[in-house]
């Protein structure tokens, strides 16, 4: 019975099983148990199931949602399941080096922590806890404009410079002030998000929001994002739909940070990023 229980748990976590939630529920019914303690989690798929149980519906929806019917999320899972590791034998694996050097950043791990906003909604340590974990495991970190914690405090917690993810508002003077603040905090690169030209139809978030009977004002009232402190954001939009490739040159005129374009989806845009002087790109999936 012990081996059968272990087998079912590992099977539930397989990335080949794209409909994880339904399968996890079936396994839980078979085992007659449900994970309730994060210390019992052994993989990220179980963590997602536990998070759904522990996190308020609206907050879980914000974290888990895709766009429309979440088809892209499903396509991501399907796509990764088609990757296969090609093992090569009888090579010296006694000293394996996974370190990378990206735009002057030397990291022990090739896995970068991409920006996730509003982490204070999920843990009291918010981005400070993430920064400490990144430092402990040798991961580089990109901090969101929408972070719950200031870039200065996160940089101090990590003990090393981070990269800053930027939403260029429709007020250029605010964008310049955010760039200057990030650079003053020690950020070596700024990652300009370009794949959010307008509002998204986040069906999963909307659906779970309706199931949440809490008053959102209880935890959101008067909580301006730290990156917007000192800025006049009255009536401003988080993103500027009028941006063109010229923004790369404009940014380089006001900052010495590397300018990385985040949200590239087609090869033609990758070529344009190079043409207009971007120092790097982050491909959106």
What residue spans do the PLM features occupy?
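Hydrophobic faces of well-ordered beta-strands that scaffold small-molecule active sites
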Residues: 111-114, 141-143, 162-164, 190, ...
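Acidic (Asp/Glu)-rich catalytic clusters
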Residues: 152-159, 274
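Glycine- and other small-residue-rich loops at beta-strand/loop junctions that grip anionic moieties
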Residues: 65, 119, 123, 143-144, ...
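Alpha/beta enzyme core
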Residues: 177-285
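An N-cap/entry alpha-helix motif that binds or orients negatively charged groups
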Residues: 27-107, 202, 211-243
């Amino acid at each position: 019975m012990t081996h059968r229980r272990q087998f079912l748990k590992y099977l539930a976590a397989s990335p080949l099983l794209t409909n994880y939630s339904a399968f996890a529920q079936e396994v839980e019914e078979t085992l007659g148990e449900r994970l309730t303690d994060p210390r019992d989690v052994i993989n990220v798929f179980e963590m997602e199931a536990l998070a759904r149980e522990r996190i308020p519906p609206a907050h879980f929806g914000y974290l888990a949602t895709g766009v429309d019917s979440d088809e892209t999320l499903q396509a991501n899972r399907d796509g990764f399941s088609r990757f296969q590791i090609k093992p090569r034998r009888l090579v010296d694996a006694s000293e394996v080096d996974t370190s990378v050097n990206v735009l002057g950043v030397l990291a022990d791990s090739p896995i970068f922590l991409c920006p996730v906003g509003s982490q204070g909604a999920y843990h009291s340590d918010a981005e400070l806890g993430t920064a400490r974990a990144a430092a402990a495991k040798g991961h580089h970190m990109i901090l969101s404009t929408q972070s719950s914690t200031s870039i200065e405090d996160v940089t101090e917690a990590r003990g090393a410079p981070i990269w800053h993810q930027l939403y260029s508002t429709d007020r250029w003077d605010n964008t310049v002030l955010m760039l200057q603040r990030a650079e003053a905090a020690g950020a070596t690169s700024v990652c300009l998000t370009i794949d959010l030209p307008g509002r998204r139809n986040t069906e999963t978030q909307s659906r779970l929001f309706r199931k949440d009977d809490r008053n959102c004002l209880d935890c959101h009232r008067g909580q301006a994002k730290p990156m917007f402190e000192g800025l006049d954001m009255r009536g401003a939009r988080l993103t500027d739909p009028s941006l063109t490739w010229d923004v790369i040159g404009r940014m380089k005129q006001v900052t010495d940070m590397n300018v990385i374009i985040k949200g590239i989806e087609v090869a033609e845009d990758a070529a344009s990023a190079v043409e207009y002087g971007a120092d790097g790109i982050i491909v959106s999936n």
